Amino acid sequence: MKSKLPETGTQGKFSKEYAFARALKDGQVRMHHMTDEAVQDPEIRRWMEKIKVFHNSELEVASNQYAEETGPHAERMLVRLKSGRVLTEEEIFILGMARRPLAFEDVRFKYKDCGSVAGLPPEDIDTIISLATGLEQLNDLTLLLQHLSSERKPSWTK
């Protein structure tokens, strides 16, 4: 379901062009950027048209030699400036994969971001994080399960 120039938020989730354009504009890509409206942002659409994504078998070989790295392949980004200068950045091990796991604060941030878009109240998100962080010390999972199986419907199901 990869989409070079996505039209919908769902397509945007699978578009490197969209992710790169959004990160360049906003410094990061968050869940609220995965809406139809955000993908249709005229400035983002202009940036996406300038972004070219190419398959690089050299990086794929480097990435695939590690069995546990079954997720996204290594990436190399080249940015050509108007001056002609080229900036390059390369990552063999994608952040969040086994060899470059997220720090706990990054996991917490991602969960809060996803939970807020899903319509969970901030206090419930904090309670779930707190309970999950101390999971090994819990004698009873009832409270955690109650928060995880709330009667509230996530915003995307309305």
Where are the regions a protein language model picked out?
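Terminal-appendage/accessory-domain detector
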Residues: 1-158
